[in-house]
Amino acid sequence: MDLSGVKKKSLLGVKENNKKSSTRAPSPTKRKDRSDEKSKDRSKDKGTTKESSEKDRGRDKTRKRRSASSGSSSTRSRSSSTSSSGSSTSTGSSSGSSSSSASSRSGSSSTSRSSSSSSSSGSPSPSRRRHDNRRRSRSKSKPPKRDEKERKRRSPSPKPTKVHIGRLTRNVTKDHIMEIFSTYGKIKMIDMPVERMHPHLSKGYAYVEFENPDEAEKALKHMDGGQIDGQEITATAVLAPWPRPPPRRFSPPRRMLPPPPMWRRSPPRMRRRSRSPRRRSPVRRRSRSPGRRRHRSRSSSNSSR
């Protein structure tokens, strides 16, 4: 009896120990699953930390390269983006998770594209700057060259020696103008047009030509706004006419044909007349028919006689 009781106690103890061991230590398959999950989480964390660190490094590098040289920034950013994508793919393959590698590739490619686009848009290449500067310099330098050429072509304008005097009364004559304007210098010519119907009356204006332009300037200064016969007059300078170029413009009018003579105008009238007999031809046929009848009637009458 004692042995059976001892055996029962020992069996009960073994069962309790098995229960404790089952509660304390999980199965080896569960341990493996948990270890795999932990390793995946660690690899994901490592991949994200590496991506963030690589992005920060890439941004710092691009900023430094932009300040150093704008032309080499685009090429270097491309190389950094390719290296970052290669490192991200290596981390993804080591971890064995396809989702993390795809996300790292897309992130690195987007960052590299944004950095390259910002660098290209923000700072233009030095070649473009030089080209723009050349264009601006050329556009600025062209107008003064044209002005210089025009100045060389243009001769200095001669000073006027002729003065136009307006708003004269009809009582003023050439002698009066000669007396007044001879005080300012030697007068070369006085032109005072007269009305056709009343030759003793002037049209109200005159031209006075001096020998020197300085004398004409004196007359303009003193007599513009002065009074003659109780009325204010106007004195203005008359510019000398420019020498005209040789008459090349007269060639087109010479090419114009003169009006045709009378004998050339007659043929179209003859043509018009030629159309009219065709219209009158049936009328003539009708007119001939009664004559024939008359002849026949006469012949018949003669035969009867």
UniProtKB/Swiss-Prot annotation:
Localization of this protein: Nucleus; Nucleus speckle; Cytoplasm
CDD domains reported for this sequence: RRM_RNPS1
Comp. bias intervals (Basic residues): 1-10, 127-143, 151-167, 266-298
Residue numbers of Phosphothreonine PTMs: 161
Record keyword Lipid metabolism present: no
Region described as Interaction with SAP18 and ACIN1: 159-244
An example molecular function term from Gene Ontology annotations: mRNA 3'-UTR binding
PTM info: Phosphorylated on one or more of the four Ser/Thr residues (Ser-43, Thr-49, Ser-52 or Ser-53). Ser-53 phosphorylation site is important for splicing and translation stimulation activity in vitro.
Entry-annotated residues carrying Phosphoserine: 53, 155, 157
Top-level lineage group: Eukaryota
Quaternary structure, from the entry: Found in mRNA splicing-dependent exon junction complexes (EJC). Found in a post-splicing complex with NXF1, RBM8A, UPF1, UPF2, UPF3A, UPF3B and RNPS1. Component of the heterotrimeric ASAP (apoptosis- and splicing-associated protein) and PSAP complexes consisting of RNPS1, SAP18 and either ACIN1 or PNN, respectively; the ASAP and PSAP complexes probably are formed mutually exclusive. Component of the active spliceosome. Associates with polysomes. Interacts with the cleaved p110 isoform of CDC2L1, CSNK2A1, PNN, SART3, SRP54, SRRM1 and TRA2B/SFRS10.
Similarity comment text for this entry: Belongs to the splicing factor SR family.
Functional description taken from the UniProt entry: Part of pre- and post-splicing multiprotein mRNP complexes. Auxiliary component of the splicing-dependent multiprotein exon junction complex (EJC) deposited at splice junction on mRNAs. The EJC is a dynamic structure consisting of core proteins and several peripheral nuclear and cytoplasmic associated factors that join the complex only transiently either during EJC assembly or during subsequent mRNA metabolism.
Protein's name according to its UniProt entry: RNA-binding protein with serine-rich domain 1
